[in-house]
Amino acid sequence: NNDGTDGVVLQALTMQPNIPVYDFDGNWAGPESVNGASQYNPVWLAQMKTNDFKRNRTMGNFYLSADPVKGLNIRTEYGFDYSDNNNRCFIPTYSFGTLISSDTNQIMQREEHSMYWIWKTYANYNKTWNGKHNFGAMLGWEMTKSSWNGSQIVKKGLSSDIVQIVTQDGEFVSNSGWKDGSAMASAFARVNYNYDEKYYVTATVRADASSKFGPNNKWGYFPSAALAWRISNESFFEGARNAMNEFKLRAGYGMVGNSSIDSYLYSAKMSTFNTPYGTGYFMANIANPNLKWEASEQYNVGVDMEFLRGRISLTIDAYYKRSKDLLLRMTIPNYLGGSTTYDDIAAPMVNMGRTSNRGFDLNITTHNIEHQKFNWTSNLVISLNRNNVDAMNSDSSVINGNIDWWSGFQTATRIMVGQPMGVFYGYVAEGLFQNEEEILAAPVQVNDANNPGVNLVNKTTGVYPGDIRFKDISGPDGVP
């Protein structure tokens, strides 16, 4: 189902439930127009079209491991995932009433190939001495690469509905191709030590380089550290072990990076379009050579407890997370490009703003009954999180999250200072209009051009009984 608003799924969702699949004569039933747009019978649509999708996928994982000296293990791993996809869709000539018909068939052939591999090598060293000192260290590197390419051809007016191949005669509707990829290289190290299973310390650092960022900002560096104290192993706790057999305090700090964006946004990409004089090119996006890693820091403290020899366990975690240099697409005026249609110049991806998250998690697990034939375990989880946009490039900056083209790019969410991330933005509903008198007396939702300042009462282009009534939140001069 690759047809968007004309696909089987969306047509089934929008079809009125009182419309039958067949009429009394056994023909396909269904309205021919809804608010001026064609409405397809989804069952007929599913049977009329041929939409074949085939995938050949090969995956594998290999490793070599060696222990050259006591306590030291060296391991190298390699994994890959290769995929070939073939999609063919054929729409024959058809007639479905007076509005939905076509005397021209159409075929679409789409091929895609993708490859992902990861190669990781690391060494682990562990040593214990005097029965109380436990030391561990790890050093390694990792490389990953993803690449994908594809092509698509659409033709219409084939001489036969039977021979459904793209090399048949017909007229080209469109042809397109794409190729993309990304790569990452990483180095990492970790050291951990504990004394007598009482005091624990861990330190980690990793450096990551991503092809998604410009030459000056490919590398990001991310440290972390953790401390823990197992109080239940202290001698002064011995008298309480019958009731509480585990009591551990934890604290940690860590930084992680985010590179979840499309490739090559630090440079300007080019797109093609057809003209009467041949193929033309236009800049697809505004470049940002200073694009860099988004970084998040988190501080957390926690406690682990077990009672009655593990029958009851309690874990509490409190955390504070702060993200900076967020990877967001800047909002720019339409005359600079960056509007919401697909053929405009995309606004630049930039690093801006800060967000914060704070909260706690509580987990209680009880092992109520443990029997050979019956086990009963209960688990209670309580979580509380509060997030906030602390800063943007200016306090008045707003980034809209728009629904796709089929809904006119309406704004559904917003990112703005002082609000949670991605807060829903829209009208406030106050119920449904019951009659025409209510519509005429209500604040204007659709202005009547012939009677300005009053709602237009119209079933398709205005407001009608049964439509949603929106709350008027405007203040002086229309400002909320």
What are these regions (language model features)?
Residues 316:
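Active-/binding-site microenvironments in catalytic and ligand-binding cores
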Residues 224-228, 361-363:
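Outer-membrane beta-barrel "beta-signal"
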Residues 60-66, 78-82, 305-307:
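Alpha-helical support elements that line or immediately flank enzyme active sites
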